Each structure stands twice: as C-alpha cells, then as structure tokens.
Design a protein with these regions (language model features):
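Short beta-strand to alpha-helix junction loop
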Residues: 108-119, 143-152, 190-211, 218, ...
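Dinucleotide-binding Rossmann-like beta1-alpha1 core, especially the glycine-rich loop
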Residues: 99-179, 185, 312-313, 322, ...
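Flavin-dependent oxidoreductases
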Residues: 66, 226-345
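C-terminal catalytic lobe of FAD-dependent flavoproteins
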Residues: 360-463
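Glycine-rich FAD pyrophosphate-binding loop
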Residues: 72-95
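Flavin-binding catalytic cores
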Residues: 273-275, 291-293, 318-402
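Helical element adjacent to the flavin cofactor pocket in flavoenzyme catalytic cores
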Residues: 189-254, 258, 262-265, 447-458
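Beta1/beta-strand and adjacent pyrophosphate-binding region of the FAD-binding site
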Residues: 48-63, 81
Length: 463
C-alpha cells in the first residue's frame, strides 16, 4: 500500500487515490491512455485535486456557462466543471460582439432560431433586472432607403409578427425622427425590445452562480484529447472519460463541448465527421467620436440583402456610452485573428484544404472583395453609414475593436444556419455531446439554448 501511495503521489491519478479503492486499482490493468495522462499530471494543480465529475463542459463562453448554470439548477447534486483554455471566461465570441439584445425579427418563422431568440430575449431581460446587470432597451430601427428595400422591410415585419416579436411596428418616413432625430430613410421597422448589454458580464454572472451552487471553473485548461479508462467499462459509478490537457487530466462520466471557434476540432477528437467546418470571419468595428455620440441613441440597421449572409454595417450604442459602427465581414487568417497581421499557419492550411471555402469565396467573390477594400480603407465604410445619418463624416470615426465569428460551413460552401449537435463513435462518443454550431444570436438566446441543451443532455445521457 505504501508503494501505491508513492505512485499516486507522483502521478496524481485523479479521484482514484482513496483508501477504499487503492487495493482495487492495484489489481487492475492500467491502460496506456491512463499512464500517459498520469504522467502528464505528475505536477500538482488545482484541476488534479478536484476529483472526478459527472459532467465536464468544455468552453467558457456564454453558451457553455449558461448551460452549466441550467444543469446545476435542475440537478444540484451533480458534480460539474467548466474548463476553459484562456485565463478568463468570455474571451472570444462572447466578449467580442456588438452587445445587442436581439428581438428575433430576421429568422424563419417556426425555426428553432426564432423560437429560442424570442424566448431568450424575455429570459435575458428578467435576468438583467434580477441581478442589476447594466443594460438598456434602446430599441432598433431597420431603415429602408428605396422602394425595393421597402418591400423587403414589409416582409421582415410579417416575419417578425409570425415570430411573436413584441411590440413591433412599421413607421413612415416622417416618423423615423421620432425614434432617432438625425436618421433618414423612406420607411422603417421599429423594435422597442431590442437592447444593449455587455454579454461578457452576463457570462461571468452565469459562471458565478454556477460556482455558488458548487460547480468548478478551471482556467488555462486547453483540451488536447479525450481517452477512455478501460477498467471502468460497464460500471456506472466510475468516470470513464479522461478530459486531457497538456499537463493535466480530469475524469468524468459525460462531456459537453461548447468550444465555439474550435468546436469542429474537438468533435473530430471523438471520431465525428469533419463537416461542418469552422471558418473564421472577422468583423471590424469603427468608433464614433465623442463629439458625435449624440447623433445615435438607438440601434440603426439597414434592410438586410437576402443574397448575402450578414446583416450589413449598423450603428450600435454601447452600455459604456461608446457608439460602434459596423461590423464588416472579412475572412480571418487565424481562428483567433482579431487583426490583419494575426496569421496562424495551421488554420490557414486547414482552410486551404477545405473545398467548401473555395465554393463560398467563388459565390461571394465581388462582395467579399468590397468588404476587404473597406477593411483596409475604412473611410469608404462611412459612405454606407451616411445613408442613415448624413452628419457622420470620415473625420468622426476611427478604428475600433474586432470580433471573430465562428461560421460553420458545409462541404458545398453553404453557411450552416441551424444548431448542430454531434456525439462521435465508440464508447467515448456515446458519452460526449458536441455543440458544433450555435448560430447568431446565440448570446441573446443563451438562456433558452441552455434549456434546450439541458433537455438533450437529460435525454441522451439519462441524467
């Protein structure tokens, strides 16, 4: 027994060093993945001393944290953990978006996106008020500039009504200034429930609640693979999956991945198909000067062109008083490529080998080139903004922050616009669920998405 204690102390085999199971472990074969993992875990860290879990969620963005919170509310006795590769939560998509609380206007009636957005809108505002999270219902104007856009605007209104978007209304040319004094257009759609919030703050509130209920959060934990503990096969009381990192590992019964920009890579680790692949698109914002902030008090959006996948540049007030203009949409050369000079060789090679990206680029070649030109010569983007507020000039703007959108793409170059869940192959795959695509507006819908995923976890894993 003394020999085993020395072995356990040296290799930190997580959650298998109790007196009750020392002898049992000594009489069992230890698999190669376990030995590798044990060797990696030879230096003590907080993750190694935590023991085994019922459920580990990979990814500390808003969908992962909201789902973790929802699962512990439903099942307070579950032992759960969130692992995040960065040194803080909400470091990527959650912390680099426009901060808009969407009302659910754009989405196909009856679709999951439409239902979850409208439900998430109401749940979000209730949560903000309950926890005194700074937010503001500034509303949104979707402004038509010509007759062709008016027809599309009317179609959007019908879609919003079918989606049960609250208090949606059409306003004529003379009434636009009632909602935004300096805004011009032929007709507009007014959505008073659209708002603004800092979604990174909301994400951290979810994580704090999760921790208060007994959940654990481990930062700087980059998952490098999943392996199976062979001696636990067929035994429900053990934790057969090892969630591996570079120098540590955590045993768990089940795994949910909500890895955003890296979701496809984690899925492949458990034998899932390569498709859909994640292609990173960078959205770059401009900042309106302090002296011109009075020009914009509400969200101002163009009528979206159905030929193109993104909503177009818009005016967005922020809870800190800033006005963001944009974003554009340009292909990034790294999955975490927030600047032009951010280039990741591995990411570029993967994109170069992916036929779906070539098909997408061919389909949107001209608008894609225009977006890249506007990215380099940003004063050109101001022309689009002047259609709505003519008083804005290129002297009033400067470069602002950027975000990277994890766009799921199939092999035919089609943008995947719905939720994608996957498991994998073999005994490991049966215990792992991958959220491979949680499409925009995932932040607004996060609490509703969490309920949906929790239902699926309960069904698939019989929790």
């Amino acid at each position: 027994m003394t020999v085993f204690r020395k072995f356990a102390a040296k290799f930190h085999v997580v959650d298998h060093c109790t007196k009750s199971n020392m002898f049992a472990l000594l009489t069992k074969r230890i698999s190669l993945p376990q030995l590798i993992c044990a060797y990696r875990c030879r230096s003590t860290s907080s993750a190694e001393s935590c023991g085994a879990f019922d459920l580990v969620i990979v990814g500390g963005g808003i969908v992962g944290c909201a789902t973790a919170r929802e699962m512990l509310i439903r099942h307070p006795t579950l032992k759960m953990a969130i692992v995040e590769k960065e040194n803080a939560l909400a470091m990527h998509q959650t912390g680099h978006n426009s901060g808009v609380v969407h009302a659910g206007i754009y989405y196909k009636p009856g679709s999951m996106k439409a239902k979850l957005c409208v439900e998430g809108l109401k749940l979000s505002y209730e949560y903000f008020c309950k926890h005194d999270i700074p937010h503001n219902k500034v509303g949104k104007l979707i402004v038509a500039q010509n007759k062709d856009q008016i027809k599309k605007l009317d179609d959007l209104y019908d879609r919003g009504i079918k989606n049960n978007v609250p208090d949606l209304q059409l306003v004529g040319k003379d009434c636009i200034s009632k909602y935004e004094a300096k805004c011009q257009g032929e007709k507009a759609l007014w959505s008073p429930w659209t708002g603004i919030v800092d979604w990174a703050v909301v994400c951290k509130y979810f994580a704090n609640e999760f921790q208060k209920m007994g959940g654990k959060v481990y930062l700087n934990y980059e998952v490098t693979g999943f392996s199976e503990m062979t001696e636990s096969k067929g035994k429900e009381d053990l934790s057969p999956i090892l969630v591996q990192s570079k120098d540590k590992c955590i045993p768990t019964k089940y795994v949910l991945t909500c890895a955003g920009l890296h979701s496809d890579r984690l899925a492949v680790m458990t034998g899932c198909d390569l498709s859909p692949r994640i292609v990173p698109f960078r959205g770059e914002y401009l900042l309106l000067s302090d002296s011109k902030r009075h020009l914009c008090t509400t969200n101002i959006y163009p009528v979206p062109d159905p030929r193109f996948p993104f909503l177009g540049v818009h005016f967005t007030p922020r809870v800190n008083g800033e006005i963001w203009l944009g974003p554009n949409a340009v292909l990034a050369f790294a999955r975490e490529g927030y600047r032009w000079r951010d280039i990741n060789i591995r990411d570029c090679i993967e994109m170069a080998k992916f036929p779906g990206l070539y098909k997408l680029c061919f389909r949107y070649f001209i608008p894609g080139c225009k977006e890249m030109i506007k990215s380099i010569f940003y004063p050109l983007a101001v022309r689009d903004l002047q259609k709505f507020i003519p008083e804005v000039s290129f002297r009033d703007v400067k470069r602002g922050p950027a975000g990277v959108r994890a766009q799921a793409l199939d092999n035919n170059g089609n943008l995947v616009d719905d939720f994608v869940f996957d498991g994998g192959k073999g005994s490991i795959g049966g215990r792992v669920m991958h959220c491979r695509n949680a499409p925009s507006p995932a932040a607004t819908s996060a609490m509703a998405i969490a309920k949906f995923i929790a239902d699926k976890l309960e069904t698939d894993f019989k929790l």
